[in-house]
Amino acid sequence: MLKKNDLIDYFYKGIKNKNDLRIGVEHEKFVLKKDSLRQLSYEESNGIKDILLKFVNKGWKPKYDDKNTTIIALERFGESITLEPGCQIELSGAQLKNIHQTCTETNRHLKELKDIGEEFGFIL
């Protein structure tokens, strides 16, 4: 059975040096058809699958399901893009040193996604 000091020691071991502290962002975006405001599905033309493939063309590395047939996530620069149950696209940012870096990362991601949206006819 755990003792109080076991728990305290566990948390003390997790304390990082001030110079090793990092921050990261996570945010989800609903992707909607511009003309109908309907949520995109994975398989439809210019849908979530095609969006992910566009990201692959921009240097993101795909991660596949167990059957190695369906892209379920992307990775680049310590960042990842994943899908939520409602087909929302989530950016999990890299571990960065300051808020300015997270701002740059978020703006880069949103620009890439909005550029694809211009081509495919969706909005966030």
Locate predicted features.
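Terminal catalytic/cofactor-binding subdomain
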Residues: 1-124
